[in-house]
UniProtKB/Swiss-Prot annotation:
Keyword ATP-binding: yes
Family annotation (Pfam families): GatC
Task of the protein: Allows the formation of correctly charged Asn-tRNA(Asn) or Gln-tRNA(Gln) through the transamidation of misacylated Asp-tRNA(Asn) or Glu-tRNA(Gln) in organisms which lack either or both of asparaginyl-tRNA or glutaminyl-tRNA synthetases. The reaction takes place in the presence of glutamine and ATP through an activated phospho-Asp-tRNA(Asn) or phospho-Glu-tRNA(Gln).
Protein name as it appears in the record: Aspartyl/glutamyl-tRNA(Asn/Gln) amidotransferase subunit C
E.C. number(s) listed in UniProt: 6.3.5.-
Natural source organism: Rickettsia felis (strain ATCC VR-1525 / URRWXCal2)
Catalytic activity reported: L-glutamyl-tRNA(Gln) + L-glutamine + ATP + H2O = L-glutaminyl-tRNA(Gln) + L-glutamate + ADP + phosphate + H(+); L-aspartyl-tRNA(Asn) + L-glutamine + ATP + H2O = L-asparaginyl-tRNA(Asn) + L-glutamate + ADP + phosphate + 2 H(+)
Subunit structure: Heterotrimer of A, B and C subunits.
GO biological process, one term: glutaminyl-tRNAGln biosynthesis via transamidation
Length: 100
């Protein structure tokens, strides 16, 4: 069981501030979490191989090939409307004002 003082110390280390009644609730919640951890620590996992992937499939990796990465011209070809030419020149998307 985590005491009220221990809960206050943990809260201070985490830079949290609690009201007096909230510290007791925090203490109870931490105690519950620590009890769950104790239960997990009791499980014997010595003969269990660690799971590294949920899929047993072999993932084919593609070769790392350097290609031209300047796609801005293609991207700005899709811009339409009155501001299309300006957007292509400055390479920014021009949108209507959203926030006043």
């Amino acid at each position: 069981m985590i005491t009220k003082e221990e809960a206050q110390k943990i809260a201070k280390l985490a830079r949290l501030k609690f009201e007096e009644d909230t510290v007791e609730k925090f203490s109870a919640q931490l105690s519950t979490i620590m009890n769950m951890i104790d239960i997990l620590n009791e499980i014997d996992c010595k003969d269990i191989e660690p799971l590294t992937s949920v899929s047993n499939m072999n993932v084919r990796m593609r070769e790392d090939v350097v290609t031209s990465s300047d796609l801005s011209n293609k991207l700005f070809d899709n811009v339409s409307g009155n501001s299309a030419q300006l957007a292509k020149e400055v390479k920014y998307f021009i949108t209507p004002k959203v926030i006043e």
